Amino acid sequence: MIRIAFGQIQVHPGDLATNFQSMMHAIDYAKAVSTDILIFPELCLSGYMVGDLWDQVPFINDCLYYGDEIVKATANTNLTIIFGNVGIDEHLRNLDGSLRKYNALYVASKGQLVSNPFQPYPFTIKTLLPCYRYFNEPRHFTSANIVAKERNLPLSDINQPLTISTRQGAFTIAPVICEDSWDTHYPDCPTSLMVESAKAKSQHIDLIVNCSSSPYTIHKQEQRHALFSAQAKQYNTPIAYTNHVGIQNNGKNICIYDGCSALYDVNGSVVEEVPAFENTVRPTLLKDTVWQPQPTVSLQTESTPTYIPTLFKALQYGIRQFLAQTGIKNIVIGASGGIDSALNAALYSTVLPPENLYLVNMPSRYNSDMTKDLAYQLAHNIGCHYGVFPIEEGVNTTVAQLESQPFTKFPLKTSSHVHKHIPADDATISNSTTDTICESQQTTTNHTEQTHVDTDLDTTTFLQLSTLAKENIQARDRSSRILAGIASAVNGAFTCNGNKTEFTVGYATMYGDLAGFLAVTGDVWKTDVYALARYMNEYIFKREVIPQGSIDVVPSAELSDAQDVTQGLGDPLQYEYHDCLFRAFVEGTPHTLPHQRLTPEDILCAYEKGTLEHLLGLSHPVSHYFTSTDQFINDLERWWKSFNGLAVAKRIQSPPLFLVSERAFGTDLSESQLKPYFPRGYEACKSRLLQNQ
């Protein structure tokens, strides 16, 4: 009977001393309860997302120093510790010429490292280095594949099972690092190679150990269970999966780590699972290879998507960790009365005391009494600070100033008969550029020039602001003037309340509602915003904190008479349909290959075949949303152009967001600012449809 423990610690990226102390506390506890094997996550000393800090040799040296201290902690005990850390080879270089580094897994026992005499290093080297989405491990690490090729060895010789001594006798583990278990689309299968290598030597593996740094996304735990359950049955071996909690970021995307460490028996059953987002050490007994799964009880209603409770926990946990990490104590939220600001306020209210939360309503003449009352109700229900700061006067002042101050067009000075000596290296410089260069260097450059001055008089023009320009001024006045000013006054920060649907097509104003220190719901689709609001009222608050009116009112920016919510006027989006369409653009669908995002050609061909409802997962036929093929095509082209147009520039300048989906904006989705592209097949399909309608 082996007692193992999951060291599901909170990992602070780049903070070696703090992570070391967390590990030592876990080690002390594991010793106190007579643990045989304590398992920590991947790169638990350094953190996974530390950017190019990996290039700094002193940082690497400190990683190795603390790793040695962990090894020493096993001296004079019966405790074996498995932990992730960087490994190096001082005599070799990475492909970029930097110090050779490995994403490594160490096994320590009796004060020293446990290794296989046939392995080249006293640690296990990660083989599959992900280089997709926001992952880019080959930037810093060398894989076991390269080591095998350098040494002219089979990959199976590089990483092998390890046998440790326990109070119950010899115990053999197969150490695996994160992606090395997710090998479906790779040519190499590290776990299979290790198991087959053991069989070839008549060696029995008692436990497969996967140490991961695996961030939360919607449905991620279901995917983990499916993978490890299948592998446990395939290899007829229990699997211990260990992950950490905390948040880490690459600047634009903030990853939330949920932990959810788990033990799987040979039947693939989940026999132990550490609760999500808990910084804890969880001991468990591995008595034999077969366990009985424990029953679970669901509190969800049929109308609540199954992932919503965990999504709420992830966002709440992310907010708490991000505020602690940045030291921000006071939060300012623009409360419009709509659902987005209401949900954001509700989320922050579960983390902050009410005295640290400021809700600000900033009405103009276009805001209805209904939404103003809803903003007031929200603040009253939360019990936080509330202020009303009308923007009409400020907006009118800005508009009046912009339309009353003239622009003067000066006459253009032109040059003719220009003869100058241009060095060969400067042959590509345009004439206008060389004119400027020569005029500023008349004492050193030989040239002759005849100057002509345009005799036209100066002209004066005045700006005439469009309705759209005036709408954007309102949004910028709210964020850049009022919210930023209040945040500065209370020594806090103001939020961006945007959602993923809006970000997809740029339905937001730069330096306006797109501003803020963090977009908590920036990776949450609008329909899920509503689902989260209903869930929080029913299960978290158990009362109506988010006013029902904010859930029921038509979504609207209320920036003009054309967006009058009292007349049922609002956003130009049918969220039930457009969420499904935009998700296909950004993430793909459950019916496509991983990372296969759909184009207008895919959408239109499915429409032509009558399969679009199935492809997008629509709850109604397409005819419910559009009355004609023409209308459907115009809508598709409008939003595809928006998605690939100015919306890209807006997303580049948007605040950081929590990554919770299959594909988030930021570094998770690499984007260039290009002209919207329509495939040739799209034009052919479009012609057929329009001819036949």
Residue ranges and their predicted role:
Residues 171, 236-237, 248, 266, ...:
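ATP/NTP-dependent adenylation/nucleotidyl-transfer catalytic domains that generate, transfer
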Residues 1-334, 344-356, 361, 370, ...:
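Enzyme catalytic cores with a strong preference for nitrogen-chemistry domains
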